[in-house]
C-alpha cells in the first residue's frame, strides 16, 4: 500500500476507526441496559453489532498501520455521540449513528480515498457502509417492536424459543415464564431457522 502520510484518507480512516471503536463500546453499554430491562434478544443483538463494529475498526486500523510509519494521526472536526439512556433511547441513537455512517460519512470517505488513489480503502468504506445500512434497519425494527409492544407479542401465531433451554412454544405471545426451565419471558425470541 502506498503511504497515507499527509492525506485526507488517513484522517478519514482515523475518524472511522475512532467512531467504530466508540460505537463498539456504546453498544456494549446498551446491551447491559437492554438485558436489565428484560430485552435479552436486543441485548444479544447489541453485542453482535458491537463485534461487527470491532471488525470494522480493525479493518480501518490495518489500513492506517500499513500506510503510515507508526505516526499519530490528528483528527479535526469529528464529533461522537454521548447518548446513554433506556433501550428505546439507545436504539434511536444507534440507528441515527448507523444512518450517518452509511448515508454521509463513508460514501464521502470512499470518494476521497478514490480521488487520492486508495481504491482498496474506498472499497472497504463502501462495503462497510452497506453493513451499517443493515444495522440501522435492524435497530429501527427493534425500536418499532418496543414502541408497538410487539417484542413478546405478535399479531399472528409464532414459534417462540427460550434461548436458555431451547423450549419451543407456539402462540401469539411468549410465555411469561418458560415452563421447562423457569426463566422469564425476557429469554424468549421468535424461532429462527436460517440453516
Curated annotation (Swiss-Prot):
Record keywords, A-Z: Electron transport, Iron, Metal-binding, NAD, Oxidoreductase, Peroxidase, Transport
Paired cysteines (S-S): none
Domain Rubredoxin-like: 157-191
Cofactor-binding details, from the entry: Binds 3 Fe(3+) ions per subunit.
Binding site for Fe(3+) 1: 20, 53, 101, 132
Known function: Functions as the terminal component of an NADH peroxidase (NADH:H(2)O(2) oxidoreductase) when using NADH:rubredoxin oxidoreductase (NROR) as the electron transport intermediary from NADH to RubY.
Protein name: Rubrerythrin-1
Native species: Clostridium acetobutylicum (strain ATCC 824 / DSM 792 / JCM 1419 / IAM 19013 / LMG 5710 / NBRC 13948 / NRRL B-527 / VKM B-1787 / 2291 / W)
Amino acid at each position: 500500500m502506498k503511504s497515507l502520510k499527509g492525506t485526507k484518507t488517513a484522517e478519514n480512516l482515523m475518524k472511522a476507526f475512532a467512531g467504530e471503536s466508540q460505537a463498539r463500546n456504546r453498544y456494549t453499554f446498551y446491551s447491559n441496559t437492554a438485558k436489565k430491562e428484560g430485552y435479552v434478544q436486543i441485548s444479544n443483538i447489541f453485542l453482535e453489532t458491537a463485534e461487527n463494529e470491532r471488525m470494522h475498526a480493525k479493518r480501518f486500523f490495518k489500513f492506517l498501520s500499513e500506510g503510515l510509519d507508526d505516526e499519530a494521526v490528528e483528527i479535526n472536526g469529528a464529533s461522537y455521540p454521548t447518548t446513554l439512556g433506556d433501550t428505546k433511547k439507545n436504539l434511536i441513537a444507534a440507528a441515527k449513528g448507523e444512518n450517518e455512517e452509511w448515508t454521509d460519512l463513508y460514501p464521502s470517505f470512499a470518494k476521497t480515498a478514490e480521488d487520492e488513489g486508495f481504491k482498496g480503502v474506498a472499497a472497504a468504506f463502501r462495503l462497510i457502509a452497506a453493513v451499517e445500512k443493515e444495522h440501522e434497519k435492524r435497530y429501527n425494527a427493534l425500536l418499532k417492536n418496543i414502541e408497538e409492544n410487539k417484542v413478546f407479542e405478535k399479531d399472528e401465531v409464532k414459534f417462540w424459543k427460550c434461548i436458555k433451554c431451547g423450549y419451543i412454544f407456539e402462540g401469539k405471545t411468549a410465555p411469561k415464564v418458560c415452563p421447562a426451565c423457569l426463566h422469564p419471558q425476557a429469554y424468549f425470541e421468535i424461532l429462527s431457522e436460517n440453516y
